[in-house]
Regions:
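Short gly/ser-rich loop at a beta-strand->alpha-helix junction or flexible surface loop bordering the NTP-binding
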Residues: 1-150, 280-283
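Surface segments flanking catalytic/ligand-binding clefts of nucleic-acid enzymes
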Residues: 1, 131-283
Length: 283
């Protein structure tokens, strides 16, 4: 069976561990050269905790550290480092006494020429996610950065990805579900949507919903599997069912192969068709 292209599973602890590991690598690299280094591209995003594995093109090595220089004459061949020229000025800041980095907005723009649209959306969704420990920027800040720097390699792909980005998502897995839904011609999914529960006279927030079709998609990550969260999810979904909504949880297995995703969306599509035809769901 064909494996799905994106390995995007992470926990907050894993994100912190990757950021710390990358920081140590950057410090070691900086101490071995007299050249001033400004870390950028995917390295900058990893320093901020992005563990999503993107589909990079062959001319980008994700196993190397990436740095940016402001002049082509400063390009060099450092060991285990890929050096890039960026002709739009370097939006540089220091994250400690030794390590200089570009802004997250610049790093996002820089990777656009090296990834596909889906990967770019995942990176943008991550950078603007709802988690206060991981959120790095907003769509408004990214748009303002675009206005300031003008054209750059990959800008068309970047603009398309930005139009598909949804701020305040909860995980890259939700991004994948949303993108796969678009590919299949299904309606627009609303992210983090409030749903009114008449029996409880309150609202609950769901990951994603086809608003007019009463079909909900939710990703059940590892943190859903402690007993309290598991019981809370069951209660929430029972209440949503009573309110006339049908919920389709996705798990790690859903993303394991393209065949699994195809089957998942066949079921989702059938539920949408059923609601449109009858105004309800069969049990």
């Amino acid at each position: 069976m064909e494996s799905y292209a994106y390995n995007t599973f992470f926990t907050l602890d894993e994100a912190r561990d990757l950021a710390q590991k990358t920081l140590e690598q950057c410090r070691a690299r900086s101490m071995r050269t007299s050249q001033e280094l400004c870390f950028s591209h995917g390295t900058r995003l990893q320093l901020a905790g992005m563990t999503a594995t993107l589909n990079y093109k062959p001319n980008y090595d994700p196993n190397k550290l990436h740095v940016t220089v402001s002049g082509a004459e400063r390009l060099s061949n450092l060991t285990e480092t890929q050096c890039h020229y960026w002709g739009h000025g370097i939006d540089q800041t220091m994250i400690d006494d030794l390590i200089a980095v570009v802004s997250v907005e610049q790093a996002l723009c820089q990777i656009a020429q090296f990834v596909d649209v889906e990967s770019m959306v995942i990176a943008l969704d991550w950078a603007t996610c709802r988690n206060e420990h991981l959120k790095q920027t907003t769509k408004d800040k990214i748009s303002l950065f675009l206005t300031d720097i003008g054209r750059f390699p990959g800008i068309r792909l970047f603009r398309k990805a930005l139009s598909l980005c949804r701020e305040n998502t909860d995980s890259p897995q939700e991004s994948i579900l949303r993108l796969e839904s678009v590919k299949r011609g299904l309606p627009e999914l609303e992210v983090n949507a409030p749903i009114y529960l008449p029996l409880q006279n309150k609202e609950v927030v769901v990951d994603m919903v086809y608003t007019n079709d009463h079909v909900i998609l939710e990703y059940d990550g590892r943190y859903h599997y402690d007993r309290n969260r598991w019981e809370g999810d069951i209660e929430k979904r029972n209440n949503l069912s009573f309110a006339g909504y049908k919920t389709f949880p996705a798990t790690r297995r859903t993303f394991a192969t393209t065949q699994n995703l195809d089957e998942y969306f066949r079921i989702v599509g059938s539920a949408i068709a059923e609601y449109r035809n009858t105004g309800s769901f069969s049990q």
